[in-house]
A protein has these predicted regions:
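Donor nucleotide-sugar binding/catalytic pocket of nucleotide-sugar-dependent glycosyltransferases
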Residues: 144, 171, 175-211
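Acidic donor-binding loop of glycosyltransferase active sites
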Residues: 288-302, 313-315
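Active-site proximal beta-strand in glycosyltransferases
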Residues: 138-156
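A charged, aromatic-enriched C-terminal amphipathic alpha-helix characteristic of glycosyltransferases
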Residues: 353-385
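Conserved acidic donor-binding segment of nucleotide-sugar-dependent glycosyltransferases
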Residues: 334-342, 350-355
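Membrane-proximal helix-turn-helix segments that form the acceptor-binding/catalytic region
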Residues: 26, 107-114, 145, 151, ...
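Short hydrophobic beta-strand element within catalytic cores of glycosyltransferases
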Residues: 306-309, 316-320
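Conserved catalytic-core segment of nucleotide-activated headgroup transferases in glycan assembly
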Residues: 202-270, 276, 280-281, 288
Length: 386
């Protein structure tokens, strides 16, 4: 008999534009590949002044994908209004220190309790720590949380005034779980300390390897969303590294694609050698244009998406040291890692004059992605068997 799994998320799976969309969808598909029957409960919490049309489109795309396995719970405007008041109070009087379960939907426990009575799920898998409150009232054979990120003291981790919780709050939330999914190695170790009686798995996110031909130009590629960490990393590269590259290689180009183009338009696109491509429907539209990709991001937590993505698209990949934290087999990953601009230039000088080395790195890219994907499958098999 197939294992029955209920995934609960306040994040939709479609359209797949952000890292968390991709991670949740990949998790669901992995469980289905391992013969689980997976239902998806989408808890929709719209802003009071949000884009109704955009939410309707994403809702419909998610519902169409899941079909008969789609479940839905909508947070009311009254509840959202109250949550906004709480958030303002936390901001003014608590330095944005949140309550552990401030985001928890009021109707979720009763709704899932009825679902469990009717359907009898073996596993419940919630997305993010703030939904683990459910497990205080509704029981399953396995009660799991896909953390996506380490949340404690996030304001200090990213050096920004953002909502945060402390380690005790995060520990108490995760201790409601029998099983915890981390998205990188360092966070796996951290969660095991917070919740020593829980089983902790490191699942990264699987990537498909896509072979790309050797191009032979002097083009650097950067595909990114528009969050502040990505903007800061790109600014560091453009101000500290790219001028040195252009001094050495007057024909060097930086191609930038993705949502980040919307927020940097007019800031960098007038700099010689930089071109903004905007939104690309298929990442291959960017990655087929050069041999080298960069990830200069030096802030943030969680999965290093751009690092893995660049390897999976068969690129020679240059990264800031922050962007290898916790990745699969960090010491042997096919990456150039440095925070020193002159070392980036020296490496490019060597790579751009040596096709054989580029082709060797491409071989290593394929082996790395295949090895990581095998590891991920084994982690899920271990989760289902434990």
């Amino acid at each position: 008999m197939s294992t029955k799994v209920l995934i609960i998320s306040k994040v939709r799976t479609h359209p797949v534009k952000m890292g968390n969309n991709k991670a949740i969808l990949a998790q669901a598909e992995m469980l289905k590949d391992l013969d689980c029957v997976v239902d998806y409960l989408y808890v929709q919490e719209m802003g009071l002044h949000g884009d109704v049309k955009e939410n309707e489109v994403s809702y419909q795309q998610t519902k169409d994908y899941w079909g008969d396995h789609f479940l839905f719970l909508k947070v009311s405007k009254i509840e959202k209004f109250c949550k906004n008041l709480i958030a303002k109070y936390r901001k003014v009087f608590c330095g944005r220190h949140e309550g552990t379960y401030d985001p928890y939907p009021w109707q979720l426990t009763q709704y899932v309790k009825q679902l469990q009575k009717e359907r009898g799920y073996d596993i419940c898998l919630v997305q993010y720590y703030c939904l683990t409150k459910l497990f205080k009232k509704v029981r399953f054979n396995k009660m799991a949380c896909f953390t996506h990120d380490a949340m404690a003291y996030k304001n200090l981790l990213v050096d920004e005034n953002c909502p945060w919780i402390n380690a005790d709050q995060e520990a108490r939330a995760l201790q409601q779980c029998t099983d915890i999914f981390a998205i990188q190695e360092e966070e796996k170790d951290y969660f095991h300390i917070l919740s020593p009686k829980s089983r902790v798995y490191n699942i990264y996110t699987p990537y498909s390897y896509k072979s790309t031909p050797y191009v032979g130009n002097k083009t650097l590629l950067f595909l990114s969303g528009n969050n502040g960490f990505n903007q800061n990393g790109l600014q560091w590269f453009i101000e500290s590294v790219f001028p040195l590259i252009r001094e050495k290689f007057s024909d060097a180009q930086l191609l930038i694609a993705g949502g980040i183009c919307n927020v940097i338009k007019g800031k960098y696109d007038n700099i010689s050698g930089i071109r903004l491509m905007g939104y690309v429907k298929d990442p291959m539209d960017l990655y087929e244009l050069g041999d080298v990709a960069i990830n200069p991001v030096y802030q943030g937590t969680g999965l290093k998406i751009k690092t893995f993505e660049s390897i999976s698209f068969d690129k020679v990949t240059l990264v800031h040291p922050h962007s290898v934290a916790g990745i699969y087999k960090k010491e042997t990953a096919p990456l150039f890692v440095s925070d020193k601009p002159e070392e980036w230039v020296a490496y490019l000088e060597r790579i751009w004059s040596d096709k054989a080395t580029i082709m060797k790195i491409k071989e290593e890219n394929q082996k790395y992605i295949e090895s990581m994907n095998e590891f991920i499958v084994d982690e899920y098999k271990r989760f289902l068997a434990d």
